[in-house]
Every structure is written in C-alpha cells, then in structure tokens.
Regions:
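Walker A (P-loop) phosphate-binding motif
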Residues: 541-582
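Flexible active-site lid/hinge loop adjacent to a nucleotide/diphosphate
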Residues: 584-710, 742-749
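Extended, charge-rich helix/loop segments that form flexible
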Residues: 400-457
C-alpha cells in the first residue's frame, strides 16, 4: 500500500508519535476506491485537472512575473474519521487566484528553487506510484493547491512529524481548493500549511526564503505540543492493536480505550501506578530498605546534609563511595568511585547543585545497567558505556568533547533524544577530569584518551543476555516497591550471571522510567517496550472498547437513537447518548442542547462509568469535525440526507451526499455490523463499504434486495403486517406486535411513521447480541414510558 504523498506504509510509522499505518482499518481501501487519488475523478470534490501540452507552455518560454499570494480562507481541524481518512487532518480552503492559469511548468525556475529548498520531495510518490513521482508531476505541470499539500507534508516530516496522507481537491469555485493534510497536532498542521504557502510563493516569485528557520519553528512546536517519546511509543503500540486513545491534556496524559474499559497513562506511569509506590521510589533510602528486606542486594548508604556529613558517611561506609542527588535524571550530578576527602567534598557540591537531597553510598564495582520491568516481567535491558575522547595533539578536551561526543546524533536537548549534550563546564565532568590530572583546556597527546563520562550512557541493548536469576530479582524489587512499571538501575559485572554470586546490587528503583534508551540503543535491537506496556494494560486481545452505535439519517433520527440507547440501558449497561435531543447518561439528561458534535461525544467516551454509547451525527458534523470515535460496533444509516444547508462547506449536489454518509459505515469494525434502510436505494448501496456484517431493515417485507440478502443467509428486520420480524436467511421470528397498545399510543403522540425508527433500533440491538426476548421487553417498556402522560 502507498500513501498519497508517496511514502510506503512501512516508511510512515512515526518515530515518536502515533502510527500512521492504519493497519487495523481499511483506510487504504477507502482512499483507493473513493475519489481520493491525485489523478482520479468523481467523488465529493473533483481532482485537480491534469496538464496538457496545449495548456501549459514550457517554463523557459514564459516570462518571469510576480503573483499575488495564495489566500488561505480558513482552516478546520477534523479530529475524527471524516470524508478523507480515519485520522485527524487539517482541511484548508485555499484560493490560488490567478495561479489557476499557471501550472508549475509555466513558472520559470520554480521547479529548481523548490527542489533545492526541499530535496526530500523526491521521496513523494504521488499518483505516479514510485519514488520521484511527485517531482514528475511537478515537472510536467500541476497546480499550487496540490503543491501546497506536498510541501506542508514535507515540512512536517522535516520537523520530526512524519505523516503520509494528503489531498488537494477543487471545490467547484474557480481557483479555490480544499487542501488536506494528515497531522497529529492542530497547531503544527496549521503552521505547516501557512509556512508551505509562504515557501511556495517565495519559490514562484523568486524571493529568498529561510527554510531552516521555518523547520526550526515547526520542530520547536512539535517538541512543545506533541506527545513525548515514551508516551508516544505506548500510544503507537496501542493504535497498532486497535486500541483507541484520547489525549486528556496538553501534556502526556492519555486515555487508552473508551468509557468503563479505558486505562490511562502518563509517560510510563499507568493508572495502576499508585501514589504510594511512586512516593516510595522517590525516597531512595526507603526504597533500598524495602528492597533489602526482600533479600535483594543494595549498596549501603544514607542521605547527607553537608559536605562534611558526606565525608563522615563515606568513612562510616568505607571507601570507595558514590555521591549522587536523590532525585537525579540522566545520571546528572553522579560521581563514582570516590576515594579521598577532597573528591567526596567536590562531588557533594556537584550533586547538591541538582536541587535535591544528596546520597552517599558504597561503590559497587561493575557495569551499570537499566532494566525495564512491566507487569512483573523484565522486558528490556541496556548496558551503559564509558565515554572517552582521544587526543590529536592539538585540540583541547573541551573541543574534543564537541567533535567526538556531542556529534553523536543521539545527543541533544530535544526530548526525543536519548542522550544529553555533554558540557565541558559540568561539575561532575570537571571532577572526573581533575581526578585524571586534567581540565577542559588540557590538550591530549595524539592517541591518549581521557574519560569524560562514566554514567548515564545507556547505549547497548542486552535484553537477550539477562540471567533468569537477575530477572527474578528485578521483578521482586518492582513488586516490593509497588510499581507495575519500573526502571531499575543495576550494577553488575556480567548480566548473564546470577546477581549475588558476583556482588552486584540494585542502586535505584524508578517510577515513570524513560523508554528512549530501549527504543534507540546505539548497539543491538530496539525493544518493543510500548507493546509490552499495551499488553500489560490490555491483556490478550483486549482493545479497551465499549459498544458504540453510530447513527445518521435525514435529520429525524433522534427517536431511533433514543430507542437504541434505551434498549442497551435496560439490558443493564450504563449507556451514554449524544443526539439531536441532547446529551444523556442513562435516564439522566445532562444537556438539552443538540449533542451531535465531536465534543459531546468525546465527553461521553471519557466518562469511566459509560459501558455503551449511542451517537447520532449529521453530514455537517462529519464535514466540519469528523466523528467523535475511531470505530464503532454498529453503524446505522436510516436515510440519505440532502445537501440543503451545506453550501458553505462546498456541498451543493445530492450526488455528493453518499460520499459523506458512507463515513458512518466506513468505521464499522470487522466484528460489527452496518444496519441499513433497504427501502432507500442510496443507503442500500453503502453496504459494500462495511468491514462487518450487513443487517437490512424494511417496511416492505417483499423488497427484492432484502430477499436477495436473505438468500445469502443475511439478517434482516422486517415490518410484516402487524409484526416486527427478525429474519436470518429463510428463518423468521416474530418479535412484537405493532398493534400493542403502547405502540399505538406512541404513534398518536409522535409525527410520521415510527416503524423505521423501531426497525433501526431493533436491528442495532440485534447486531450487538441483545437477545430477542430482552429486545421485546425493552421495546415495550420504552414505548410505555414515552406514551405515559407527563406529570407536572
């Protein structure tokens, strides 16, 4: 499969945020079979026109001129499944003005300037289907809307946010296009489109443009706005398993799953990580006390108050010792193998500068390791390396650090990098050099080496070497502290041998451990730590989903929505309902305002009491926001709505409506069902888009399409005379009499024919596995309640 901007599915797995592979969806079928291809026609919006030799003169023959800027009329963030794809996108309405008459091959020098600024565009395959495909389109002639799409995607990629989906479509208004790009963050996506417009106009008008500064701004925004790498790798793994997620704040608090089935993570902490356990892990003395009580070796040591106290502790413990901050990170402020009073005193100052208490403990000889324990199992292990610089007879040690150490692409200040920049003025580094008789200004003779960092360089994966005894001891330590996920720092000579036999010891047990060292080791394989955490939270085939029913009609579908919710609620499930009549939780109405939008739906899915949910939607909300859920168990389409009131969204023709409404069926899970009104031919035609089963309903039991469906052993809900009938193939079961007093009373109270609403609701409940007897009882109870006179 290929994404429209040219990257293959395998290439588009994001390095630090959610995956774009959509492997649990049939999104690529949607893209390929719908209008979504840069050279395809038809569908909701027509594709950009092709360029013929008669239309586009050779660029060399065209005079250079200055064009007015492309105008971005508005941008919308479609947060849920939409007419374009299953994932969040930015949709921009773009007016290219007079450039409608000037394709790319009619703009002198444009191709050369654009490709020089963004050489990565060669990776975009576009509709050509191979590397360099977009550049072929660019050279042969394509329009600025299409170019804007690819440039925005490339800017996001250069900023560290790889995404693989983009579209540019004409709206029907001359020179006005819908430009759509996949993004993981609204602010980043919008800035990418605005920056792409500025860059494209600079290339068209032969003006200078600072590409590096633009990418730097976007990179900074990605770092500030997007999920951190540890959280993101868990979300990626969950997404690959079909587990939905909702970001709950601007940081790294993420909900995995929906409603009562949800779990929550915050970086590498989960809702099973207790505050008590985290508090214990922060108290290093208490942690060592508890771990030692369980029989796991730890170094002797204590917290100290001053440099003098540190030396007294060192004398009591016995030299050599380690001095470190109690709450250090990335081994900042840690000094090892200290043997003299002067060294201990200097090390205390370096540790105290980190802003926490200072610990002195016995030095354990060996190599430092970090082991990740998840759910009582060691799932990853890395070994540290000592960092040296090698002299050339000319450069100072400070210069050698910059040229030999800080050039490592894994080092830097960005959150997604596993190692920090090494600074020559760091107090621990100064002490380390002093102990070697050196300073940052010392010049090493050619071939001589100096140690510049002893701790914090977890770079070598050793997961496959961990001895079972060590794995057992690490799991025990995590359990004693009370952490479901723990990063354990271990010093041992050989991780492939039993712990106690070689005098190794646990030096720290950490809550919320960083995962980058396991994702980006310098040597060895990256470990699937995100997958391990996802499995820990959702064992087996768990997806964290609650039953969701999505429904769309012609604006009169609230009754069916309320019927479905009542059937589920009366089955004993706490059911949320967001529909045109308002927002409901069980029998309680939370709001009387229309709740068709994204936010009311998401509000219900965040609620931990919700065991099932029913969401009514409309074409406008699909176009303007997207659905509030990624997939549903049941998708119901009652009627094909018309285009009235959608002109501002460039929908003016009834022929455009099926492509909008199909979104509701596109998101049906493979184990779910589409419930379709067989009496509406346009609705019936949506059956092909369902990944799951199709259940038809009809007030005409002799309808030919229903008969053909039943001949294929399909299920249908029918109104036959006085009966509502459940049919599976040739088998039929009478469910309830429509002549029952509660039905007739309800019919007199409500306008129109209530039968389609009842049939749709019965079909949805049946699709969810509600037994017929319970459907019957719940249906009669609902009608009884609705038909009862109001009490004032």
């Amino acid at each position: 499969m290929e994404f429209s901007n040219g990257a293959t599915q395998a290439q588009e797995v994001a390095p630090y945020n959610e995956s774009d592979t959509e492997s649990e969806h049939s999104a690529m079928r949607r893209i390929d079979q719908n209008e979504h291809g840069p050279s395809s026609g038809g569908g909701l919006y027509p594709s950009a026109p092709g360029v013929s030799a008669a239309v586009a003169p050779a660029s060399a023959a065209a005079p250079q001129r200055t064009f007015a800027d492309i105008v971005i009329r508005r941008m919308a963030h479609l947060r849920g499944p939409n007419i374009w794809t299953y994932r969040a996108v930015i949709e921009a309405i773009v007016d290219i003005g007079e450039l409608e008459d000037y394709p790319s091959n009619a703009l002198p020098g444009f191709y050369e300037r654009l490709t020089a600024w963004l050489p990565g565009l060669i990776e975009h395959r576009c509709s050509v289907g191979r590397r360099g495909g977009f550049l072929m389109r660019l050279r042969d002639g394509t329009w600025p809307g299409h170019i804007l799409e690819h440039v925005a995607l490339e800017l996001q990629t250069q900023a560290g946010m790889k995404t693989g989906f983009g579209k540019a479509r004409m709206t029907g208004e001359h020179g006005v296009y819908k430009v759509v790009i996949r993004t993981r963050n609204e602010a980043v996506g919008k800035l990418a489109i605005e920056s792409a417009r500025d860059l494209v106009m600079a290339a068209i008008n032969d003006r200078p443009y600072d590409v590096a500064a633009t990418i730097a701004r976007l990179t900074d925004l990605v770092d500030r706005q997007c999920l951190g790498p540890s959280t993101a790798c868990i979300v990626d793994a969950a997404t690959e398993r079909g587990i939905p997620h909702i970001r709950l704040n601007d940081g790294n608090l993420v909900q995995l799953g929906h409603g009562a089935a949800q779990r929550r993570i915050w970086t590498a902490e989960t809702d099973r990580t207790s505050a008590i356990a985290e508090g214990i892990s922060r108290d290093k003395d208490l942690t060592k006390q508890l771990v030692a009580a369980a029989g796991v070796p730890v170094p002797e040591g204590r917290t100290v108050e001053s440099a003098e106290d540190a030396w007294e502790a060192a004398e009591d413990i016995g030299l050599p010792v380690v001095v470190k901050p109690s709450d250090g990170n990335h081994a900042r402020g840690v000094s090892l193998n200290l043997k003299t009073r002067e060294e201990v005193m200097h090390a205390f100052a370096a540790a105290e500068a980190e802003g926490s208490e200072v610990i002195v403990e016995s030095f354990i000889p060996g190599q430092e390791h970090r082991l990740l324990v998840v759910g009582g199992k060691v799932v990853a292990a890395t070994r540290g390396e000592i960092i040296h610089v090698s002299g050339d007879g000319k450069s100072t040690i400070g210069q050698l650090i910059d040229t030999q150490v800080n050039t490592d692409p894994r080092r830097g200040e960005e959150e997604h990098l596993p190692l920090e920049t090494l600074r020559a003025g760091d107090a621990v580094l100064l002490l380390l050099l002093q102990r070697q008789g050196l300073t940052p200004d010392s010049v090493l003779p050619r071939g001589e080496t100096a140690v510049v960092q002893r701790t914090g360089n977890m770079a070598i994966d050793v997961t496959g070497q961990v001895h079972p005894d060590i794995a057992e001891q690490m799991a025990l330590a995590a359990r004693v502290v009370g952490l479901d996920i723990a990063g354990i720092d271990l010093v041992v000579e050989d991780i492939a041998k039993p712990l106690r036999a070689q005098g190794g010891a646990i030096v720290e047990v950490n809550a919320g451990p960083g995962l980058l060292m396991h994702l980006k080791p310098a040597v060895g394989r990256a470990q699937p730590v995100g997958e391990a955490i996802a499995e820990h939270l959702f064992p087996g085939n768990g997806t964290g989903r609650v039953p969701i029913v999505g429904l769309i009609g012609d604006g009169e579908s609230a009754l069916a929505s309320r019927l479905i919710a009542a059937l589920l609620q009366l089955q004993g499930q706490q059911t949320a309902l967001a529909c045109g009549d308002g927002l409901f939780l069980g029998a309680r109405q939370l709001s009387k305002a229309s709740a068709l939008g994204y936010e009311p739906g998401e509000r219900m899915l965040i609620n931990r009491t919700v065991q099932a949910a029913v969401f009514e939607t409309s074409p406008r909300h699909i176009l303007a926001e997207g659905l509030p859920y990624d997939r549903c168990q049941v998708g119901v389409v009652m009627a094909m709505p018309g285009p009235e009131g959608l002109q501002d969204l460039y929908v003016t023709d009834a022929e455009q409506m099926p492509n909008i409404v199909r979104t509701q069926i596109d998101v049906v899970l493979p184990q779910g069902a589409a419930v379709l009104n067989a009496d509406d031919a346009e609705v019936l035609a949506l059956a092909d888009y369902s990944d799951g089963e199709v259940i038809l309903y009809s007030i005409d039991p002799g309808q030919a399409d229903v008969a053909a469906h039943r001949a294929r052993k399909g299920r249908a809900v029918l109104a036959r005379g006085d009966d509502i009938v459940l049919a599976t193939g040739a088998d039929e079961t009478s469910l309830v009499k429509l002549s029952a007093p509660v039905f007739t009373e309800l019919t007199t109270r409500l306008p129109g024919d209530v039968r389609p609403h009842v049939l749709a609701a019965v079909g949805a409940a049946w699709a969810l596995g509600v037994p017929p007897d319970l459907i019957r009882a719940s249906l009669l109870h609902f009608c009884e309640v609705q038909a009862a006179p109001a009490v004032h």
